[in-house]
UniProtKB/Swiss-Prot annotation:
Role, per record: Potently and selectively inhibits voltage-gated potassium channels Kv11/KCNH/ERG. Acts as a gating-modifier toxin that shifts the voltage-dependence of ERG activation in the positive direction and suppresses its current amplitudes elicited by strong depolarizing pulses that maximally activate the channels.
Recorded superkingdom: Eukaryota
Signal peptide boundaries: 1-21
Other noteworthy facts: Negative results: does not show effect on crabs.
Organism field: Bunodosoma granuliferum
Compartments it resides in: Secreted; Nematocyst
Name of the protein described by the UniProt record: U-actitoxin-Bgr3c
Residue stretch(es) of the prosequence: 22-29
Length: 74
């Protein structure tokens, strides 16, 4: 019984530590990955209907279940 309790506490402690160690900076937590709008390279955002503000995006195209947003001069 105490082994189960110990493992449970270990898992809970690990989850708390992982959530506290997560970066708070928006630029650090950017969720985009590379994508292409024709020949223009952009950043893919899942489940978005418009490009997030504050990143300098000037255009976008529809991409699989989200958007591919690209900045000026791309």
């Amino acid at each position: 019984m105490s082994a189960r309790r110990f493992l449970f506490l270990l898992v809970v402690t690990s989850l708390i530590a992982a959530s506290l160690a997560a970066p708070k900076d928006v630029q650090m937590t950017k969720r985009g990955t590379a994508c292409w709008c024709g020949q223009t390279k952009g950043v893919y955002w899942l489940w978005k209907i418009s490009c997030p503000s504050g990143y300098g995006y000037t255009g976008y195209c529809g991409y699989f279940m989200g958007l591919c947003c690209y900045p000026a001069g791309s």
